[in-house]
């Protein structure tokens, strides 16, 4: 069976090897699909992430090419000349050639005859005499939709200063730290516009496809067909087309998820990584690359600027920025100086003591009723990404932690608690070691149950859900987004997908149903992730003329992550988290490696690995 391969180098001298070298049966591509710069990137991926050549190559080459996909084309009729002297009895030809002249390259021969009543005989005659010709035109299978024109927004003084600081920066690596609603997207667009006018290209990365409807709407509305979109929901043919458009210079602005970083952009001048704190920029499939590291390498390779944008940067990125490894640019105020929405922490232990066993606190329920009466919209957020069944006491909020690693232990169905860092196990106690309560349970609730509860208590509310189940179909995120934007629903229930990037002026209440879900992940970044997600979700409220309100439900309201999030105090949170990381030796003070072993005999495998 023939095997596909890539030629990376040519050697004139004979190479002696211990294996049989097979002949090349055919060369699939007339022109190289891998450039010298690509080879440098491939070698970086191999050395940095310990992957095979072919795994690195596949990141750069779309699946469509590997499966033999080609550009889709059609033959259109193109005008050449209207000199009819060579045609005898040319009556009636002038009307035909004038129509083609007005619509050159627009219609196929079949469309001209069937839809516009043009005689096939006359078309063939005009082709025969060289007055028109049939020409192949590439048909792109995606992204043909027209978008409303996006008008440039007037910049605030702070935005103008940020743009100037970035453009004048001698450093190519820049952290743009801007509070939610501060206008980071408009800053991105102005920077992209400058790069494009210089004849260069730009890449704008977003964490996942859920964010792209609004980003696409704005960027396509501003830059039109010059935008290429690249993400996992495209078919192989569509991915090939977008790759081809970028390679041929037909699209200079790329918007996509992490894989878009590998597109063959011509004269790359700018890479923007929006919401840089998101863990979706790290690939969990081979090769397990970190997009930010790849972007930094490309920046050194091509001399382009890289902007990491976030309201809540990772501890590592902020540490690098304040220690001078990258330039720090800040946007500290919302557009029109709108206030950040007021955030309230609700102690769910008190709710339980008062006899309320609903997933909604009395405060959240009352606020939901008020907003619905005013015709305002609500977002209910349930953080289930990386969801882990931790065990907690509902009476006092105690969570069963590992004494060695200071992270929550995970509940397993055999009744044991396991630390996924050091492997420590212990049987789940029946009583809380802190308060002696019997009300010890593992934690969990899904979006479907939340929807049921809303329908039970707020019967007239119109509800939309945005989660993995409701967004499997193509363009489903955009349909839900557009429906909520158009006011077709009062309440949007969602997971991580609703936490950022969405701008709904009529949303005045955000309810975070359980801050404890992210706070008790078995991960040293649990506090950081909680601070980030709460700040990001809170930023969805009060983005219009009306003030917003955020209600956070938790069994541990005293936790420093929630207390700093309530005040939108990133700097003090950073100082606290930084101190803890230093004590524990966690990044940026050390590196954590996960080494997986696969074998039939567990004891033998342990010996080999140790």
Where are these regions (language model features)?
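Conserved nucleotide-binding/hydrolysis modules and their immediate coupling elements
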Residues: 1-33, 109, 416-421, 435-440, ...
């Amino acid at each position: 069976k023939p095997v596909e391969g890539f030629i990376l180098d040519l050697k004139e001298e004979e190479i002696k090897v211990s294996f049989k070298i097979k002949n090349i049966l055919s060369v699939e591509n007339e022109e190289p699909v891998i450039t010298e710069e690509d080879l440098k990137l491939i070698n970086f991926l191999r050395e940095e992430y310990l992957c095979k050549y072919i795994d690195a190559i596949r990141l750069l080459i779309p699946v469509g090419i590997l499966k033999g996909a080609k550009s889709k084309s059609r033959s259109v009729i193109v005008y050449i000349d209207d000199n009819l002297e060579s045609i005898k009895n040319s009556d009636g030809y002038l009307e035909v050639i004038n129509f083609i002249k007005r619509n050159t390259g627009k219609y196929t021969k079949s469309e001209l005859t069937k839809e516009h009543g043009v005689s096939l005989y006359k078309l063939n005659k005009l082709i025969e005499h060289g007055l028109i010709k049939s020409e192949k035109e590439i048909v792109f299978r995606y992204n043909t939709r027209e978008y409303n024109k996006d008008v440039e927004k007037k910049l605030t003084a702070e935005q103008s200063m940020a743009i100037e600081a970035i453009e004048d920066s001698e450093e190519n690596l820049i952290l743009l730290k801007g509070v939610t609603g501060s206008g980071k997207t408009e800053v991105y667009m102005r920077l992209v516009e400058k790069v494009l006018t210089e004849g260069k290209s730009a890449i704008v990365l977003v964490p996942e496809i859920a964010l792209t409807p609004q980003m696409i709407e704005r960027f396509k509305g501003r830059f039109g067909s010059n935008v290429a979109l690249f993400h996992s929901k495209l078919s192989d043919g569509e991915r090939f087309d977008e790759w081809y458009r970028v390679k041929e210079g037909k699209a200079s602005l790329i918007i996509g998820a992490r894989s878009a970083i590998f597109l063959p952009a011509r004269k790359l001048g700018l890479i923007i990584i929006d919401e840089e704190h998101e863990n979706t920029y790290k690939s969990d499939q081979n090769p397990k690359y970190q997009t930010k590291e790849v972007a930094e390498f490309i920046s050194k390779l091509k001399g382009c600027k890289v902007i990491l944008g976030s309201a809540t940067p990772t501890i590592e990125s902020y540490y690098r920025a304040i220690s001078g490894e990258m330039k720090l640019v800040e946007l500290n105020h919302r557009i029109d100086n709108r206030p950040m929405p007021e955030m309230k922490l609700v102690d769910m232990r008190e709710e339980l003591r008062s006899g309320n066993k609903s997933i909604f606190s009395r405060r959240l329920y009352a606020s939901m009723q008020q907003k619905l009466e005013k015709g305002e919209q609500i977002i209910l957020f349930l953080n289930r990404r990386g969801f882990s069944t931790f065990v907690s006491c509902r009476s006092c909020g105690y969570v069963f932690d590992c004494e060695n690693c200071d992270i929550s232990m995970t509940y397993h169905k055999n009744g044991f608690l396991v630390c996924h860092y050091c492997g420590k196990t212990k049987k789940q106690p029946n009583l809380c070691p802190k308060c002696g309560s019997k009300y010890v349970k593992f934690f969990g609730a899904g979006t479907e149950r939340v929807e049921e509860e809303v329908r039970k208590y707020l019967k007239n509310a119109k509800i939309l859900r945005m989660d993995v189940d409701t967004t499997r179909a193509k363009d489903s995120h955009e349909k839900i987004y557009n429906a909520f934007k158009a006011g077709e629903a009062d309440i949007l229930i969602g997971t991580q997908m609703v936490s950022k990037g969405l701008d709904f002026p009529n949303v005045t209440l955000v309810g975070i149903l359980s801050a404890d879900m992210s706070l008790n992940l078995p991960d040293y970044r649990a506090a950081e992730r909680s601070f980030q997600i709460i700040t990001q979700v809170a930023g969805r409220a009060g983005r219009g003329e009306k003030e917003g309100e955020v209600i956070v439900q938790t069994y541990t309201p005293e936790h420093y992550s929630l207390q700093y999030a309530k005040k939108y105090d990133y700097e003090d949170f950073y100082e606290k988290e930084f101190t803890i990381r230093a004590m524990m030796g966690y990044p940026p003070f050390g590196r954590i490696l996960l080494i997986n072993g696969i074998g039939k005999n567990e004891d033998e495998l342990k010996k080999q690995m140790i």
